[in-house]
A protein has these predicted regions:
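A structural signal for multi-pass alpha-helical bundles of membrane permease subunits
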Residues: 5-6, 10-278
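N-terminal hydrophobic targeting signals that begin at the initiator methionine
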Residues: 1-2
Length: 278
């Protein structure tokens, strides 16, 4: 009796492809980390492993003038911006998902249209408004304040998730005497935690990695720089300490990697369930 080796070969092929893809994405980070532990001279060579492990590079980066200020600014931008986005987007998404009112479809179309609008289209008018009219140039407030008025992508993602919550739960809460606000706070929000977590992570990662925004509004004030923009200061006009640049990059990447590692279950669940019902 001849054995069928096709399932075994398929299993080997799939796992080999998965391992190859994993190595393709992981190896650049390994190279980044190893380079961060090299001396300044060795970082310019083709060596892959440090001759001496220069852990002091991280201390040098940490004590770089302004680095802690960039950390504080980034936490303010990402943390406060994420909080404002969630607070402002949840009520709008709830109304679009669970209320029946005239103009609901038009409102949803406007949200989708806002998602399709390239950010570069509004850069000049937004800069003229925040920097010239309100004189907020040199600060991060032109990036934080707009988040208090909702984000189209966050509203759409939350709306899709809230559609998966059965209306019977809301009807039961209303029968028990709950108003819409109490229903939202006591019934909807606890059930919408995965969707809210996904939106919060998307917004936090966007703000943490944002380079374009701080470059426009805060480039002339080093005290308002964020980590992503502050990394540019490690590049010299004639010489760049690549070991310190790589060490700074690791310190910038580490918080978001750790955050995603601990929140990935809620993130994946929230993103998956947003596509269940339309």
């Amino acid at each position: 009796m001849r054995r069928n080796y096709k399932p075994v070969l398929h299993w080997i092929g799939v796992h080999a492809l998965g391992v190859a893809a994993a190595l393709f994405f992981v190896l650049p980070f390994v190279f980044l980390f190893l380079t961060s532990l090299m001396s300044d001279q060795q970082a310019l060579t083709r060596d892959l492993v440090p001759d001496t492990w220069e852990w002091g590079n991280y201390a040098k980066v940490w004590h770089t003038p302004g680095f802690l200020t960039w950390w504080r600014n980034t936490l303010l931008y990402a943390g406060l911006g994420t909080l404002l986005t969630v607070i402002s987007s949840v009520p709008v998404a709830y109304a679009l998902a669970k209320f029946r009112f005239r103009g609901r479809r038009l409102a949803l179309l406007l949200v989708i249209a806002a998602m399709m609008l390239p950010p570069q289209v509004v850069v000049i008018p937004m800069y003229l408004f925040w920097a010239k009219q309100l004189d907020l140039s040199g600060t991060l407030w032109p990036l934080i304040i707009p988040m208090a008025f909702g984000d189209a992508f966050s509203i759409f993602l939350l709306r899709q998730f809230l559609l998966t919550i059965p209306d019977e739960y809301l009807d039961a809460a209303r029968v028990d005497g709950c108003g819409e606000l109490r229903t939202l706070l006591r019934v909807v929000l606890p059930m919408a935690k995965p969707g809210i977590a996904a939106v919060a992570l998307f917004q936090f990662f966007y703000a943490w990695n944002d380079y374009f925004g701080p470059q426009i509004y805060a480039s002339d004030n080093p005290a308002a720089w964020t980590l992503s923009y502050g990394l540019e200061s490690f590049k010299g006009a004639h010489h760049t300490n690549w070991n310190l640049t790589m060490a700074a990059t690791v310190l910038v990447m580490a918080p978001v990697i750790v955050l995603f590692f601990f929140a990935q279950r809620a993130f994946v669940e929230g993103v998956t369930l947003t596509g269940v019902k339309g």
